[in-house]
Amino acid sequence: DKLESARTTPEADDLQAIAAAMVEQGCKNLVMEVSSHAIDQGRIKGAKYEVVAFSNLTQDHLDYHLSMENYFQAKANLFASEYAKAAVINIDDSYGKKLLKQVKIPVVTVSRKDSTADWYLAKAEIKNGLYQVEIKSKSGESLSENFALLGDYNLDNLLLAVAIVNSAGLSLDKIAPTISKLQSVPGRLESINVGQKFTALVDYAHTPDAVERVIATVKSVTSGKIIGVLGCGGDRDASKRSL
């Protein structure tokens, strides 16, 4: 069944009702996004996660949080024993490094750049429109697979996903075969084809960092001209528009 949600993270009672319905229908696992608004407003009170993960933090939602420090601390509140048993943190991000210093629950680190991380991207080469990736763990385990989702942010997400499900108990021999089957979600570099003679892509990127990453990804696989059309939603954080 598909249930529509008006928010990234539902209200506390709705969240528990959805989780209960999933259990009744035989679901064994729940993967969800927890927004900074939801943490700040107590929407995840009563929830306890096996693993929580931190990818990065860039300017967004300052109309609500007012400062990047407030925004960071709202996110950091999720990484506490009240809500989680363990954490996975991307230490390539400066706020990830900051979070690593203050969390009190067990932590697994991931990185595309730092080979001392618990999970490290040892290789990512583009061939025939696909990444050939090799991921290594500090314990000596490794996997090599094709990965179809281009862009550094997708490599970050892949590292996080591998670390999350491994921390939750899934072995690498079960994880590896699924990587080549992964597909992009709607609205993330989604191809639109109505018979035009050029490639048209739609992406949800709405922060300076996200827009920069998307353009860099498109440049890496494009030989011709790139035209970007950006929109700015009204009554939101106006300070990032000039960025």
Task: State where each predicted segment sits.
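Short beta-strand segments
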Residues: E33, N90, V229-G231
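Active-site beta-alpha connecting loops in nucleotide-dependent enzymes
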Residues: V185-G187, D209-L243
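Conserved nucleotide-sensing/catalytic segment adjacent to the nucleotide-binding pocket
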Residues: L3-S35
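Short glycine-enriched, charge-decorated loop/helix-capping segments at active-site entrances
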Residues: K2-T9, M68-E69, L149
